[in-house]
Amino acid sequence: MAKYAIGVDFGTLSCRALLVDVKTGEELATSVLDYPHSVMDEELPSGKKLGADWALQDPQDYLDVLKTTIPDVIKQSEVNAEDIIGLGLDFTACTVMPVKKDGTPLCFIDKFKDEPHAYVKLWKHHAAQAQATKLNEIAEKMNQDWLKLYGGKISSEWAIPKLWQILDEAPEVYDEADRFIEAADWIVWQMCGHEIRNSCCAGYKGMWNKKNGYPSDEFFKALDPRMEHVIDEKFSRDILPLGSKAGEVTAEFAAMTGLKEGTAVAVPIIDAHVFVPAVGITKPGEMLAIMGTSTCHMLLSEEEIPVPGISGVVADGILPGLYAYEAGQCCVGDHFQWFIDNCLPKSYYDEAEKQGVNIHKFLRQKCERKKPGESGLVALDWWNGVRSVLVDADLSGMMLGMTLRTKPEDIYRALIEATAYGTRMIIDVFRENGVDVNSFYAAGGISQKDPMTMQIYADVINMPIKIADCEQGGALGSAIYGACAAGAQKGGYDSLYDGAAALGKVKDKVYYPIPENVELYNKLFDEYKILHDYFGRGENNVMKRLKELKNS
């Protein structure tokens, strides 16, 4: 009798559920649904305006999409719920919310419905940069050893800066919140009926590590005396490892989704990290870039080596027995969409419509006619700040070399190239610090839909690129974790390595570097590095001064 697992992938804008045969890997059904409130970065549903760099979500959206997507894949596949042995999920991170001790989000409570700090702070909420800057200064002053495991800087995207922002700006929300929790863990709480904390989010976004736990109470007291016991008061020291079972589906959640009560639920994982088993990566030196609105770079190693500017290195962070490094770029697909939404003449839309192609494809067709360097443009890919390797949300984008002859497709291609240069910066910093990058894989929407961009990346990094063979790679990865939560006795797997080997897959198509393009891109990358260091490492802080004027 065939057995199945469901993987649920919570992205930035939508949720995807996938039902898969745990032995054959056959994908029987997929369901995708956008969040009703999407990303709230200008105002709350009430109309209350938000400040600069805010990005919120409504947790009710997460429950609503589950009520639709899980029943949908069960119905489509026509499988018996009795044969669905496991459920896994991944989520964006650090995406966090304040809740009561029973799990009720504060934004569900009437008196907080108009309070922005009561809502979910999405991963790309960057309004806690002031708190992140202070945290880094204090950590350096106190010689905190754990800081070097995060590239020497904590990001404004992470849990503690976001909670500290709440304490500074809305202390009544801080006081009312019994727990401050990752959305991934909150969803499992709704599924299983009890609070859990996963090692992936805690390790990469919460400053926890397997060996030493969290930073000391003394450190948190130095941030703010009110935060001295923040870990015990708002978080938890009980951290569950990846690849294990978080709990079982409750009767209430079973009734809501059509799953069987008692179905195994996996410890959740971050939405980027979950792609690693989905492409079958199990060896050190294999890097995976998950390319969507942003890009996250995952790399496995047998060694723990501090690397400046990365997002973190966590023991067993993806697979047991290996260190998993994370780096990333916080604006990739968002760059391209910004350009489409704001910078194209109507004539381009008219011509695309006439040809019967979407506007991205229309622009790419124009870009493909040009060779590297032909436009004379170099851009800095910082439209949403910088994650790796500068870790600075106060930096902004730049386009150099425009003339009266510059065309929209030139700018579009320069933005694509800039994101490729950013990935090469990340690869170079790993290698310079003794961490091998031997092979490169890509997953996510861009890798599936955009051959031109993938060829540019292969040329810029001068490495072959293998592509994930699953349009819903995040959901497939989550299904693998779900099958492992069930275990071999129930028809799943006892090891993530076994699950990845059986179900992970890549396409036959490989993008190989084109030597003449590599030579040209090496020259362009040298120019990118000059701009990167000049504007990003303090020689000229004009971007920060402009942002201060904008926000004054």
Regions found by a protein language model. Name each.
Residues 66-85, 170-173, 219-232, 257, ...:
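Phosphate/pyrophosphate-binding loops at sites that engage ATP/ADP/AMP, CoA/4′-phosphopantetheine
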